[in-house]
């Protein structure tokens, strides 16, 4: 039986590569080539194994940790596929979540799929790797997470991890792209309680102050608006879906996408909050539209119970959100 050797920069391994491995594994013995000269090969292999576990492939796929010279010497029993060169590449995943991204011909060698550049994952520009790998990267602070922790306190960072995880679960349950949900949940508080927002204060005032009493944006609202500027400048993220989910996660507004709603509710009901929210989480899992309205109503009731309600919630964005979704 011939064996496949897949060659790519698997640092970290991406969703498309995992899908290819899963398909090929039905008909071939699959090997993943890792260059033994890489200084961080041990961690790369550990991360690959996390992805293989998510795809139930951990005991079926072999990781070939050898040099390139040794790879070239392998005999004709091995079919070598260079995924970086044999896949049509457009630098980014553009198909919608859960659509078929590729097919294999009758020999299961020819592929037509959307290429994912692993460096985009390293930089935090896209999150299209397995959920266990995302958790490893963010919890153990690898790749892009090394930059994120520069701006967030320990408690704030723990909060964004919880929001990211809840966002992923709710999105997955509602057939919404869970990787974008994790990404938006993870980045949503990037400019909260740090000096980053000061760099963008003038831009935000000019664009959004008209929605607030006396044209003054409350301090706790700034970070939702400044986030997208930091995402673009620091991480080169240009995805408007991510921008928008972060832009209104505190105030809400009257034309929210499903992704916007996922991040909004996840921020409000993550388990670190000091009020019971498990029933709201279940409602969101079952139906994000019903869950969003339930969370919005619960949040409105909570804010109205506060003595400072008139000063914290009387902005046109939140008022429009209540009017559109609760009336």
Predicted regions and their residues:
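Divalent metal-dependent catalytic cores for phosphoryl transfer on phosphate-bearing substrates
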Residues: 52, 61, 149-151, 168-295
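Long, amphipathic alpha-helical surface segments
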Residues: 288-309
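Nucleotidyltransferase catalytic core that binds NTPs
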Residues: 1-147, 232
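Charged phosphate-binding loop/patch that engages nucleotide di/tri-phosphates or the phosphate backbone
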Residues: 126-147, 302-327
């Amino acid at each position: 039986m011939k064996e496949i050797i897949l060659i790519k920069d698997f640092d970290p391994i991406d969703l498309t590569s995992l899908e290819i491995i899963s398909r090929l594994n039905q008909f071939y013995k699959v090997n993943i080539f890792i260059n033994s000269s890489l200084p961080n090969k041990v961690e790369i292999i550990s991360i690959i194994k996390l992805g293989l576990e998510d795809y139930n492939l951990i005991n079926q796929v072999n990781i070939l940790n050898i040099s390139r010279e040794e790879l070239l010497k392998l005999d004709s029993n091995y079919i070598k596929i260079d995924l970086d060169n044999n896949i049509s590449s457009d630098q980014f995943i553009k198909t919608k979540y859960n659509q078929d991204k590729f097919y294999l011909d009758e020999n299961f060698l020819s592929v037509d799929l959307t290429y994912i550049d692993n460096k985009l994952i390293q930089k935090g520009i896209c999150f299209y790797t397995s959920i266990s790998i995302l958790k490893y990267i963010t919890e153990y602070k690898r790749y892009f997470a090394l930059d994120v922790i520069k701006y967030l306190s320990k408690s704030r960072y723990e909060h964004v991890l919880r929001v990211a995880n809840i966002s992923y679960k709710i999105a997955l349950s509602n057939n919404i792209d869970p990787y974008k949900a994790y990404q938006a949940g993870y980045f949503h508080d990037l400019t909260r309680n740090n000096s980053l927002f000061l760099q963008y204060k003038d831009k935000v005032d000019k664009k959004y102050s008209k929605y607030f009493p006396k044209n003054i944006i409350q301090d706790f609202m700034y970070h939702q608006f400044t986030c997208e500027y930091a995402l673009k400048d620091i991480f080169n993220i240009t995805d408007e879906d991510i921008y928008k989910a972060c832009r209104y996660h505190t105030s809400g507004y009257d034309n929210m996408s499903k992704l916007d709603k996922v991040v909004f509710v996840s921020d409000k009901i993550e388990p670190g909050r000091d009020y019971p929210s498990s029933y709201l989480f279940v409602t969101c899992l079952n139906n994000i539209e019903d869950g969003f309205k339930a969370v919005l109503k619960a949040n409105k009731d909570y804010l109205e119970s506060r003595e400072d309600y008139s000063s914290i919630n009387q902005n046109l964005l939140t008022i429009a959100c209540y009017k559109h979704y609760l009336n």
